[in-house]
Regions:
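Carbohydrate-binding/catalytic loop surfaces
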Residues: 102-109, 147-156, 198
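Conserved, well-structured interaction surfaces
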Residues: 19-97, 102-143
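Beta-strand acidic-aromatic groove motif in beta-rich domains, primarily in extracellular
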Residues: 4-11, 92-95, 181-182
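Residue-level preference for alpha-helix termini and adjacent loops
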Residues: 89, 93-95, 148-150, 154-157, ...
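Aromatic-residue-lined binding/catalytic grooves and analogous aromatic/hydrophobic interfacial grooves
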Residues: 6, 122-144, 155-198
Length: 198
């Protein structure tokens, strides 16, 4: 409930002028609140710690089962990118490719490189595409359906989620790179069956 409040009601809805009240918020509609934007960044950093540690942990401790944990790794990547988009909307450049080095066994990168939002969107689009393809074609996976609060381990729904997040990327690119945005949207819509169940 806290993230829904901060992200939707208290922040975005009023910034987009969908509603005008300032309940629960002591400044004007157009004043940035560090508490809300800080929580988006914290959520991104925390998601990254786990998303980057999962494949490293499996590779280090259970190398013979690495292929069986592909779905878990890709779902974590989708969640991390979703959080990254939210944080990048507020902060712009973020650490991503070089981030969480000690969590993925790369202890040599002590000063990771920040990437611009444009670079991040390109990277994230490609990674979401890869994640959707891997989830759609994987077999003999360790199940985590009892821990998957979103889709109860249904990987076809995670494929749709990956393609839906690609739609977010297309929307962010629409004014600056309309041809690229259109290509992403068409590819995502055709490959993800996003609207097949509506």
């Amino acid at each position: 409930a806290g993230e829904t409040w901060a992200d939707s009601y208290a922040c975005r809805l009023r910034w987009m002028q969908y509603c005008a009240g300032i309940w629960g918020y002591s400044t004007t509609n157009f004043t940035e609140c560090a508490g809300f934007s800080g929580s988006l960044y914290s959520n991104y950093v925390n998601a990254g710690k786990y998303a980057r540690h999962i494949p490293y942990y499996v590779k280090t401790n259970m190398p013979e089962q690495e292929a069986a944990y592909s779905d878990l790794t890709e779902v974590a990547r989708i969640l991390l990118i979703t959080k990254g988009i939210q944080a990048s909307d507020v902060y712009g450049s973020l650490v991503y490719t070089d981030g969480w080095g000690t969590r993925n066994g790369n202890v040599e990168i002590l000063e990771p490189t920040f990437q611009t939002q444009e670079e991040l969107l390109t990277t994230w689009n490609q990674e979401l595409k890869e994640a959707a393809n891997k989830l759609a074609t994987s077999s003999n996976q360790v199940t985590f359906k009892n821990y998957d609060l979103a889709y109860s381990g249904d990987m076809s729904k995670w494929v749709k989620a990956a393609n839906a997040v690609r739609m977010r990327i297309a929307l962010r690119l629409l004014k600056q790179k309309p041809a690229e945005a259109k290509a992403i949207a068409q590819e995502g819509l055709s490959s993800g069956n996003i609207f097949s169940s509506i």
